[in-house]
From Swiss-Prot:
It comes from the Archaea. It comes from Saccharolobus solfataricus (strain ATCC 35092 / DSM 1617 / JCM 11322 / P2). The keyword Amino-acid biosynthesis does not apply. The keyword Methyltransferase does not apply. This is Transcription factor E. Monomer. Interaction with RNA polymerase subunits RpoF and RpoE is necessary for Tfe stimulatory transcription activity. Able to interact with Tbp and RNA polymerase in the absence of DNA promoter. Interacts both with the preinitiation and elongation complexes. One of its GO terms (molecular function) is DNA binding. The gene is tfe.
């Protein structure tokens, strides 16, 4: 069975790529807050590179920070920590993003008429087909009407599935907090 840290790392890797994993792993291994300078020293890389990685991780919810002002210099010091306890919320947010994209695509499919090239399966909106006299731009073949009912049905099914997952996971999360 995969442990929570491995799942957390794999999720970060799939969303942000390998580049941020070294910073995330250091924070997980340390188990306490660290400054960007401490991380840079341990990884032997530039502080600016660490900050870029931390900002990417923070945008997706993998890490968070608290800031304090240095009494001597007046500069802010950022203390970073991993949000491994937020893994479910990160996944939920990702599902919501995917759901929005699927709904946008479904609207596009519903609101447009399409034509397809029988030779190379290139798909054109009505406007594109009309501009090109209903001929394929690649091979010149006559375009034929393309019925998008299967695509719309598939998108509707996926949307329902993800909505049910989000609803179920949101209720589970709410029950854990009580």
């Amino acid at each position: 069975m995969v442990n929570a840290e491995d799942l957390f790392i794999n999720l970060a890797k799939s969303l942000l790529g390998d580049d941020v994993i070294d910073v995330l792993r250091i924070l997980l291994d340390k188990g306490t807050e660290m400054t960007d300078e401490e991380i840079a020293n341990q990884l032997n890389i530039k502080v600016n590179d660490v900050r870029k990685k931390l900002n990417l991780l923070e945008e997706q919810g993998f890490v968070s920070y608290r800031k304090t002002r240095d009494k001597d210099s007046g500069w802010f010091i950022y203390y970073w920590k991993p949000n491994i306890d937020q893994i479910n919320e990160i996944l939920l947010n990702r599902k919501r993003l995917i759901l929005d994209k699927l709904k946008t695509r479904l609207e596009y499919e519903k609101n447009n008429t399409f034509f397809i090239c029988p030779q190379d399966n290139s798909r054109y909106s009505f406007e594109e087909a009309f501009e090109n006299e209903f001929k394929c731009l690649k091979c010149g073949s006559q375009l034929t009407y393309y019925d998008t009912d299967k695509i719309k049905s598939f998108l509707e099914q996926k949307i329902r599935q993800i909505e049910e997952e989000i609803d179920k996971e949101t209720k589970l999360g709410a029950n854990k907090n009580h």
